[in-house]
A protein has these predicted regions:
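Catalytic center-proximal scaffold of phosphoryl-transfer enzymes
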Residues: 1-169
Length: 169
């Protein structure tokens, strides 16, 4: 919830908390929680499978008052569907960029299966010339199905229609 909205909610209840004070609290909280966030990502990288995705996150550019696009990278480990007993873990990383350098830095040292949506930035991890040749990319079934469905809906491929029929639940 944006701080300006929190400030308004508190004000309705006659609690005056300045937005700049809340921003300072958020900064301090982020600093204090950083070791926990690093631990979560380290545990995720110990798994055989990691699911990754990135999403846009509008943020205010300091001093300009205008929004810019930043990215929230998400990394998930959940071995329960594969017989694992550990709890699911999620880690987030904030970046100003969607470049492959971000995911390479976040998952440095990871070896295993990386399930992603097909965005080219992830290819960097699977290329042997990038130093992370122990990563095997796995496509997201939903994203793959969408491509077949688009061909099926356009009526341009019998094979795509057959594939969609086989993928249907």
């Amino acid at each position: 919830l944006p701080l300006y909205r929190q400030e308004a909610i508190y004000a309705r209840d006659q609690v005056e908390i300045d937005r700049s004070q809340m921003a300072q609290w958020m900064g301090k909280l982020g600093f204090e929680l950083e070791p926990l966030a690093d631990y979560a990502l380290a545990r995720i990288k110990q798994g055989e499978r990691v699911f990754a995705d990135e999403t846009t996150l509008p943020t205010l550019a300091p001093g300009s008052g205008k929004a810019k696009t930043a990215y929230l990278w998400t990394y998930v480990r959940d071995d329960r569907p594969f017989g694992g007993s550990g709890p699911p873990i999620v880690a987030y990383r904030f970046e100003d960029s969607r470049a492959g350098e971000c995911v390479a830095r976040h998952l440095d040292g990871y070896r295993g299966i990386l399930q992603v949506d097909g965005y080219a930035a992830y290819n960097r991890l699977a290329r042997s010339d990038r130093g992370n040749d122990g990563v095997m990319l796995a496509a997201c079934w939903s994203h793959v199905r969408r491509k077949f469905y688009e061909l099926h809906a356009a009526g341009s491929s019998v094979i795509a229609s057959q594939t969609v029929a086989q993928m249907a639940p």
